């Protein structure tokens, strides 16, 4: 029972409910993520992912997509050794999408240009140079950043961490989340 209840452990639990009280009868450890326990930064980031997942979860309402995202992010940090900034940005953007805050990444909100040059953080949409409205908090986006955002928002969960970004692009991508 101890191993399954550790911080950043994934386990399957058998719960017995009687007269409004719940008791754990059995627990099976699925994954422990031991690599995250030996590095304070990784442990902190993994704990942050768990806290976000807790905030976005509803009691008695299973959310397999959020569980998969959280476990994949922990796996990407610990086993795959993906850059922390990349894993954090991917996790945050995909979690926002799962929570119903999917950004409009089709093209410019005004003219439909498929390759706009800035993203409105408040409005969650893209805008190009010709259509600058001035309203909102904008961040410049390159084609690489836009491709990464589109990938994270729309790809299957199994392909979520299957891309790399250069250092500068990664820093800019991280500033969007």
Question: What are these language model-derived features?
Answer:
Residues 1-177:
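Non-catalytic alpha-helical scaffolds and adjoining flexible linkers that form interface surfaces
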